[in-house]
UniProtKB/Swiss-Prot annotation:
Pathway: tRNA modification; tRNA-queuosine biosynthesis
HAMAP family in the cross-refs: QueF_type1
Family from the record: Belongs to the GTP cyclohydrolase I family. QueF type 1 subfamily.
Entry GO terms, CC: cytoplasm
Chemical reaction(s) catalysed: 7-aminomethyl-7-carbaguanine + 2 NADP(+) = 7-cyano-7-deazaguanine + 2 NADPH + 3 H(+)
Subcellular location: Cytoplasm
Record carries keyword Cytoplasm: yes
Any one biological process term the GO annotation gives: queuosine biosynthetic process
Pfam families: QueF (PF14489)
GO molecular function: preQ1 synthase activity
Protein name stated in the entry: NADPH-dependent 7-cyano-7-deazaguanine reductase
SUPFAM superfamilies to which the protein is assigned, alphabetical: Tetrahydrobiopterin biosynthesis enzymes-like (SSF55620)
Biological function: Catalyzes the NADPH-dependent reduction of 7-cyano-7-deazaguanine (preQ0) to 7-aminomethyl-7-deazaguanine (preQ1).
Length: 129
């Protein structure tokens, strides 16, 4: 049976919850509709997060992202909605979603939204000589 788009995000247990590490996911084929014109808007999404107890399952993420292809949404709203949905299920220590929309009317739009778990501070980056 072919997969169908849906909004049910799934997670799996973080294999190393005691460690801060970053997961980066690039989604080059995001599509939604312009709510003003009904024309498709295309974007590349860059998801970066530090998991706590759960990680997002990639097939469910793919189907979730696919569910936006026929939905009208402003760039700012859809970026923040996706971030809110992901943080609700994953409960990460930190998550950033950057949406780079393709040119529309000679204008490129990039929207970046972040979530940070209260009390969590990023570890210092080690700079080697």
């Amino acid at each position: 049976m072919p997969s169908q788009p849906n909004r049910e995000l799934e997670t799996f247990a973080n294999p190393l919850p005691e460690r801060d590490y970053t997961i980066r996911i690039r989604i080059p084929e995001f599509t939604c509709l312009c709510p003003k014109t009904g024309q498709p808007d295309f974007a590349t999404l860059q998801l970066e997060y530090v998991p706590d107890q759960a990680c997002v399952e990639l097939k469910s993420l793919k189907l979730y992202i696919w569910s936006y292809r026929d939905q009208g949404a402003f760039h700012e709203a859809v970026t923040n909605q996706i971030l809110d949905d992901l943080t609700a299920v994953c409960k990460p220590r930190f998550m950033r979603l950057t949406a780079e929309f393709n040119v529309r009317g000679g204008i490129y739009t990039t929207v970046a939204a972040e979530y940070r778990q209260p009390g969590w501070d990023a570890p210092k980056i080690v700079r080697l000589p």
